[in-house]
């Protein structure tokens, strides 16, 4: 029997990497791209956790209701796609509360989990963990790699309870569960990200499959993630965006379907039995 893993979607629009005040300049594509993902999940009998921007919930409440009605889980991805490393504690918590209030009002269910935009919990923003522990049962923001954009290379690679002052240290007394993004460890080189998103588009499929299978062979589960824009071969060009936003979009849907076929997935809530 295949090991159950966790599937997640970071539910945001293609322009959400831009400053919030510029978002109104762009035409939304999130309904089209999210429905594509929902249909792929239905076809492959997959349930997922949708880390949802409060902004998206505010603009498209019927989309959130549809996701919820199909048996998927709604979790928080903040309200305005904040980089936690660049804001104050007060601004972060206010944004977080706004997101949770919007999503809980739409679904009528408690929001149990969070993922930081840009995976922006690292050594500059460890303070955020204490705030997260007040609102959530789990977090999935830590990426145990080191890239120019994010990551904590020496963080645990498997699910754990993080110390709230230094979350790369485990602390069994903490109620918050951390679910790090999937990596493959290569001697000398270190951890290679294989969790989805850009890496789904960039890495050869055979290597991603190999790395994820290796996790399951060790009797561990992994979490995978996708953005709606990752499957949008017609994503509009944005001048501020670099090559990695558009790389290999034409082949991404086919690769994602292979992931859905080759592994078993469920929601984080169902996996954790919470």
Model-derived segments and their meaning:
Residues 34-38, 61-65, 93-100, 129, ...:
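Generic structural signal for well-ordered alpha-helices
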Residues 1-70:
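Active-site beta->alpha N-cap acidic-glycine motif
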Residues 105, 109-110, 116-219:
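Active-site-adjacent pocket scaffolds in enzyme catalytic domains
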Residues 21-27, 90, 239-245:
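Short glycine-enriched, charge-decorated loop/helix-capping segments at active-site entrances
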Residues 42-45, 138, 202-274:
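C-terminal domain-boundary segment and adjacent tail
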Residues 16, 44-125, 136, 141-148, ...:
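Metal-dependent polysaccharide deacetylase catalytic core of the NodB/CE4 family, i.e.
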Residues 10, 77, 81, 227:
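Histidine-centered divalent metal-coordination motifs
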């Amino acid at each position: 029997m295949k090991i159950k893993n966790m599937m997640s979607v970071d539910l945001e629009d293609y322009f959400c990497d831009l400053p919030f005040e510029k978002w109104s300049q762009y035409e939304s594509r999130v309904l089209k791209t999210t429905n594509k993902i929902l249909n792929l999940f239905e076809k492959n009998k997959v349930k997922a956790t949708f880390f949802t921007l409060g902004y998206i919930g505010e603009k498209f409440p019927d989309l959130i209701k549809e996701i919820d009605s199909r048996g998927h889980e709604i979790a928080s991805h903040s309200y305005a796609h904040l980089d936690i490393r660049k804001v104050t504690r007060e601004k972060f918590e206010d944004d977080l509360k706004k997101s949770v209030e919007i999503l809980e009002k739409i679904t009528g269910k408690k929001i149990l989990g969070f993922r930081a935009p840009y995976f922006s919990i690292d050594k500059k923003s460890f303070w955020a963990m204490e705030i997260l522990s007040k609102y959530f049962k789990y977090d999935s923001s830590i990426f145990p790699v080191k890239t120019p954009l994010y990551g904590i290379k020496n963080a645990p690679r498997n699910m754990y309870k993080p110390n709230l002052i230094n979350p790369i240290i485990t602390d069994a007394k903490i109620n918050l569960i951390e679910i790090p993004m999937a990596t493959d460890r290569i001697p000398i080189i270190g951890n290679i990200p294989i969790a989805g998103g850009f890496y789904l588009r960039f890495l050869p499929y055979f290597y991603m499959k190999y790395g994820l299978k290796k996790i399951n062979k060790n009797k561990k589960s992994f979490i995978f993630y996708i953005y709606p824009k990752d499957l949008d071969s017609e994503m509009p060009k944005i001048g501020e965006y670099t090559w990695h936003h558009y790389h290999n979009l034409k082949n991404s849907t086919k690769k994602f379907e292979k992931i859905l076929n080759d592994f078993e997935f469920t929601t984080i809530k169902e996996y954790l039995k919470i």
